Amino acid sequence: MDPNCSCPTGGSCTCAGSCKCKACRCPSCKKSCCSCCPVGCAKCAQGCVCKGASDKCSCCA
């Protein structure tokens, strides 16, 4: 158990579905936030938490 995190080591945060995850500070489960990308963009939504659907995404450019 990481002292900085409420989740078990290697597990996922309880706030994994939200971009307001400020309580979790352990690198093992902290994920960055990004807008959800349109269908067909394979580069996005990998290792990040989607904060909402979007027709445009910087990582799909």
UniProtKB/Swiss-Prot annotation:
A divalent metal cation 4 binds at residues 33-34, 44, 48. A divalent metal cation 5 binds at residues 34, 36-37, 50. Coiled coil: none annotated. Keywords: Acetylation, Cadmium, Copper, Metal-binding, Metal-thiolate cluster, Zinc. A divalent metal cation 2 binds at residues 7, 13, 15, 26. Metallothioneins have a high content of cysteine residues that bind various heavy metals; these proteins are transcriptionally regulated by both heavy metals and glucocorticoids. This is Metallothionein-1.
